[in-house]
Amino acid sequence: MNPKDGAIIQMSFTMTMFPCVKFPQGTKPDYRLTLLTLEDDYQMELSCVKEDNSTVQPTVKMDRNMNSAGEREEILAPSQPMYVVEENFEFITLNINGYDAIIVPKWRGSAGGSTYEFAVDFGTTNTHVEYKVGSGPSKALDITNEHIQMSCLNVDALKNTNILPSIRNNQIPYKLGVDIKFPMRTLLSYKTATDWNQPFWPYITGNMPFYYGSVVNNKFNSLESDLKWNSPEQMVKCFLASIIMLIRNKVLMEGGDLPNTRIVWFYPTSMSMHQLGIISGIWNQLYSDY
């Protein structure tokens, strides 16, 4: 067979990506791409290619289900290397066990320019997020059919009882506002082996577990609940960053005016000035970053 003719090779895996929108000029791109497979002998790598055919290498790669020996912590859960990509790109190149493939995202997003305002109540037990567009009514933060933030290469994977829990526990929700909705428990789900003195990234290291209570947490994750008062600053920042990524994605997907997006957050009068200073500093940093 002439190698130039190509071939069809069957591989058992899927890939998710969010957000599936190109970032406007002046906004720092921030994508999450995840490869998921139940196969033990797959060597998988990806990179992204820009419009000028130059290659974008991921900034970070981490698999929450992989231990220091390179073995899966939870045998029934997939290996799931997740990548951070911080540049716009056109398509993805994928290599599995020496076989190359190209994946072209179906980019979404809308033209617009509407002004969005969000209100975040970071509570001790529950966290609630509402928003309004322009002078419209306020409603709980949602992800609708028209503006789904996450793309899945093989939607049948969303029916796989071994793969689906990892997607629901460690990534943004496919939809938000019906089966799951705000307010939600104030929890951070994170890789148990995390060293919080090292750099961390939302959804790579940890995130708000949107399906908490309806999906069993993965064994390789731990839960932190006392975020508002006694948790390390890095944990609080990771939790809030997982929410602010949802907010930014929503504005971009719906064609909103990102530079003029407003975020209001609340705090109790009983909060000490020291703790208020920490929370305020985290919000200011996240608003600047995103």
Label the model's feature ranges.
Residues 129, 136-141, 256-257:
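Short, solvent-exposed secondary-structure capping/transition elements
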Residues 127, 267-269, 290:
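Active-site neighborhood for divalent-cation/phosphate handling
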Residues 109-136:
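Gly/Thr-rich phosphate-binding beta-strand-loop-beta motif of the actin/hexokinase/Hsp70
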